[in-house]
Amino acid sequence: MTNTVFRGESRDGHVMRVAVADIYDELLLERIRAESGCRIIPVQRTEDEIRRMLRADAQRSSEALLRELESGKKRDASSDSMPVISLVDSILESALEQGATDIHFEPDSQSFKVRFRKDGLLHDYRALPAWIAEPILIRLKLLAQADITERRLPHDGSFTFQGAHTQANVRLSTLPVQYGEKCVLRLLPTNDDAQTLDDLEFSPAIRQAFRNAFSAPQGLFLITGPTGSGKTTTLYAGLREIIHRDINVTTIEDPVEYTLHGANQVQVNEKCGFTFATALRSVLRQDPDVILIGEIRDSETAQIALRAAQTGHLVLATLHTNSARAAETRLQDLGIAPKLFRESLIGIVAQRLLRKRDPQSEGYKGRIAAVEFLRPDGTYVDGDLKENALRLVREGVTDMGEIARVFGS
């Protein structure tokens, strides 16, 4: 697990006190002993206590680095100086430790703000001095192999960050704004515990409907919802139910966000003309059994997907609509005949992510998907989207304030 250990400092070079969640984890203690060369004194702490220790340590580290930069900023504030490199690493480490999905670097006239997106909302991390913006952005662009000389145009890139406990794929996006460049990093941990349908906490009836859909020999299964509503997570959880079978699974994504062992993952590149439709045509020549399409964006992709679903392939895809019923209208707008759509359809799911109440505080911790599962005959499995969201309120998982935030008053 990510937060099972917090290492103290060795005062004499021979003995180190270490906070651990499990003092009987001999493999962990032996690894720390080998890496540090010290005799280890384990001190048992809860996971939450260790998280607080890690947050405080990261804060102290970044403050010390800033003091170091402040003291010599005129001579050593370049992007390749150790303090700048360490500060960037410290910010990334803190974001991963706090479970953030995105980091926002935002310049204004007085400061360079850093914010973390956690459980769907942005939270202030800290305000850095404005002069540090340029070396931090250059450092991030170098990591992502983006052009450091051009600040007037947006840039995209990616890199891998190895933290103390977690490795993450990082997607970078920059945008010219009034006071410089805004940068957003999307964090995609590579060693998260793989979620299954059981982990997603659906009702028993909806969970079984998912399993039936993913076991179908052919047809079209859609998941709809806005960006960031967990559509890919749900599709991957379903694929993990079947990927061990003797089948050929291929995904077409933009971009590939998570590694799915046992699947052939294809990343489209529209700048080079390798679109979803182009990729889908090629995949159909690869003898696929199951095809996941990251998003049906255009008429051509929709037409090919429907034909594939009618010719012996299980096709899983996402759409951007507000409800399951709106998916048919969206496909009609893309030129799909209603009769053809209904003949191929296995089911449509719409979902939203709601923050979960934290029993240890008055706030929230983690998120859960509220879903509706629409059958081909137009009936719902276990209620529509808002009914299932209200069920989560009755069960004490979330509250009405969160319902109002996500669905509106």
Task: Specify the residue positions occupied by each region the protein language model found.
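Short, flexible helix-loop junctions that flank or precede catalytic/ligand sites
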Residues: S81-S94, Q98-S409
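Charged, low-hydrophobicity low-complexity segments
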Residues: Q44-E93, Q98
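Core recognition of P-loop NTPase motor domains used across DNA-transaction enzymes
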Residues: T2-R11, L27, R31, C38, ...
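Polyanionic, low-complexity intrinsically disordered segments
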Residues: M1-E35, H155-A164, N169-L175
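Generic amphipathic alpha-helical segments used as scaffolds and interaction surfaces in large
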Residues: A19-V20, I41, S78-M82, R394
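Short glycine/Trp-rich loop-beta-loop segment that forms part of the substrate-binding cleft
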Residues: R17-R60, E201-N212
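Long, low-complexity, intrinsically disordered polar/charged segments
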Residues: F6-M16, E70-K73, V283-D289, A308-Q310
